[in-house]
From Swiss-Prot:
It comes from the Bacteria. Fe cation binds at residues 194, 275. GO terms for molecular function: ferrochelatase activity; metal ion binding. The gene is hemH. Monomer. This is Ferrochelatase.
Length: 320
């Protein structure tokens, strides 16, 4: 029987190529054109996107990217490349490619890279622990479009989510413990997840359940009382209701109520990016301290830590 050669495709959202209005505009146009992300009628959405959102948001968002840009590129790209390289070192016999839903490197370039290595089976690992149609679903859609153009397609194993994976929860717990040891145990551990429109959940997206699962399992691993762990949702966009409670409003309320010390972790982000390093670590710090809070720390994403890479290796092992 012929031996199967397996490759691994790490997938994430994507990032602009540069912290400039032009690069951000290109990225946002591709991102916000995906029906998985914004499903508004195209007749209504296109004029709003092209005539209002892109011209107004691109310069402002470019400045935010510039504030966190690293020598090797955006934080998401730097940490994603580190993850790819570390996993390849951990699994030296297995090709590992990196692809983004939007921007570069594309998912198509990642598939082609693996096919050039003569793999006949690809394990796709979207680096979103909690499934959502707007993230994991977008990877699935693009992968299907890519393979529809191939005469010969490889076998595909697609990891839908890993919200309660034992290694993932332990890696998060150890990261929290290290932060507590460094800064002292806070009055409250706030777990902030990227939000989605409430309507998506109402229509069947089980993302909120996955977030609750991760929150419950992490609190259990840390042996923390339920009242000392809170789950919120960040990064809302547009006017329709998103999952609640909102992170920024919650931090303001907690500061006003006299909560003195908070530490914030974003368990849904496998790599630090604009939404964690600027929105959570900077903007929301100001919100909390400005409302009367005394001490605020952001706990970094797992990024390319050895525990995170080992988790990835163990996760894909079941599909190789």
């Amino acid at each position: 029987m012929r031996q199967t050669k397996t490759g691994i495709l790490l997938a994430n959202l994507g990032t602009p190529d540069a912290p400039t209005p032009e690069a951000v505009k290109r990225y946002l146009k591709q991102f916000l054109s995906d029906r998985r992300v914004v499903d508004t009628s195209r007749l209504l959405w296109w004029p709003l996107l092209r005539g209002v959102i892109l011209p107004l948001r691109s310069p402002r968002v470019a400045k935010l990217y510039a504030s966190v840009w690293m020598e090797g590129g955006s934080p998401l790209m730097v940490y994603s490349r580190q993850q790819q390289q570390a996993l390849a070192q951990r699994l030296p016999e297995t090709p590992v490619a990196l692809g983004m839903s939007y921007g570069s490197p594309s998912l198509e370039s990642a598939v082609d890279e693996l096919l050039a290595e003569h793999v006949d089976h690809i394990v796709v690992l979207p680096l979103y622990p909690q499934y959502s149609c707007s993230t994991v679903g977008a990877v699935w859609d693009e992968l299907a479009r890519i393979l529809a153009r191939k005469r010969s397609i490889p076998g595909i194993s697609f990891i839908r989510d890993y919200a309660d994976n034992h290694d993932y929860i332990n890696a998060l717990a150890n990261s929290v413990r290290a932060s507590f040891a460094k800064h002292g145990e806070p009055d409250l551990l706030l777990l902030s997840y990227h939000g989605i429109p409430q309507r998506y959940a109402d229509e069947g997206d089980d993302y909120p359940q996955h977030c609750r699962t991760t929150t419950r399992e992490l609190a259990s691993a840390l042996e923390m009382a339920p009242e000392k762990v809170m789950m919120t949702f960040q990064s809302r966009f547009g006017r329709e209701p998103w999952l609640m409670p909102y992170t920024d409003e919650t931090l303001k309320m907690l500061g006003e109520k006299g909560v003195g010390h908070i530490q914030v972790m974003c368990p849904g982000f496998a790599a630090d990016c604009l939404e964690t390093l600027e929105e959570i670590a900077e903007q929301n710090r100001e919100v909390f301290l400005g409302a009367g809070g005394k001490k605020y720390e952001y706990i970094p994403a797992l990024n390319a830590t050895p525990e995170h890479i080992e988790m990835m290796a163990n996760l894909v092992a079941a599909y190789r």
